[in-house]
């Protein structure tokens, strides 16, 4: 039912024929999505969804056009405009906003920041916060995803940037962390760089949607960063990733072409080749003579 607080046009009723769901965001904006939290939960153990993290609106638009199931997007509270632009670039894709670890110091601040992200159209929140913070989000109805395994910003606790869960003690600790997230009300968990066999067993034993990055198959979602998929960086890339394109080489080629173009321009100016006859405007000699005659009468 439409209310006075909702914004935008009511989504068309034929959305289902396009495999889209009619939704309202937490801020009251109508929209269409490929999935809802409930849809993804119902797919657990039935089909592996495909996820990427988009860094730019162009990446997000390409991901949606390609058929990526879900997106993660970094949300910077100091400049939320980029996240909003990415949301607009992929309006129909289920999108979780990843919130910075050290941006908040209490559950109340965490909830306030989560609401800020949901206000621009987030479908869920991804965070590396403790279960106590996640509980605050869950109690307010915000779908929250936790993070276990190699959590880079907390890697001092696990011995640096390395695989986690290669011993039975570490694997049991992962299980306990996941159960704590369950108890806090999380709906999903990102599991990073753990043994594939451990992921498979963990995913079977939790109601949470498991998003695997560097943890092999067996999770509910397979996740890689967009820049890793597209080879959009100088490398080295993470061992767990695969590069399907080499956009970095294309960017380097474009930069080389920029430099070459500027150098040719400089050379043409210095040699007198530019501007040429086709680049300038001419007038009759009579006009020039008349101008010079008038110019001589002007005060110097």
Question: PLM features: residue spans?
Answer:
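Alpha/beta enzyme core
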Residues: 2-300
């Amino acid at each position: 039912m439409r209310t006075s607080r909702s914004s935008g046009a009511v989504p068309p009723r034929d959305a289902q024929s396009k495999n889209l769901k009619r939704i309202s965001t937490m801020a009251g904006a109508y929209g269409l999505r490929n999935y809802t939290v409930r849809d993804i939960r119902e797919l657990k153990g039935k089909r592996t969804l495909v996820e990427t993290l988009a860094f730019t609106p162009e990446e997000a638009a390409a991901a949606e056009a390609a058929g990526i199931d879900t997106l993660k997007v970094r949300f910077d509270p100091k400049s939320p405009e980029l996240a909003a632009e990415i949301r607009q670039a992929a309006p129909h894709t289920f999108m979780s906003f990843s919130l910075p670890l050290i941006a908040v110091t209490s559950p109340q601040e965490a909830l306030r920041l989560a609401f800020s992200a949901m206000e621009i159209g987030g479908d869920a929140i991804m965070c590396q916060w403790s279960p106590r913070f996640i509980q605050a989000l869950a109690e307010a109805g915000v779908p929250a995803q936790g993070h276990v395994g190699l959590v880079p910003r907390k890697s001092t606790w696990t011995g640096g940037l390395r695989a986690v869960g290669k011993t039975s003690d570490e694997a049991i600790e992962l299980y306990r962390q996941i159960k704590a997230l369950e108890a806090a009300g999380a709906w999903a968990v990102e599991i990073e760089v753990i043994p594939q066999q451990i992921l498979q067993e963990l995913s079977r034993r939790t109601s949470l949607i498991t998003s695997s990055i560097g943890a092999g198959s067996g999770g509910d979602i397979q996740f890689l960063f967009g820049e890793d998929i597209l080879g959009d960086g100088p490398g080295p890339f993470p061992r767990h990733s695969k590069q399907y394109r080499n956009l970095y080489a294309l960017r380097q080629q474009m930069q080389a072409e920029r430099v070459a173009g500027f150098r040719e321009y400089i050379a043409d100016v210095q040699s007198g080749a530019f501007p040429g006859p086709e680049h300038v405007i001419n007038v009759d000699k009579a006009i020039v003579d008349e101008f010079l005659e008038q110019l001589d009468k002007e005060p110097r």
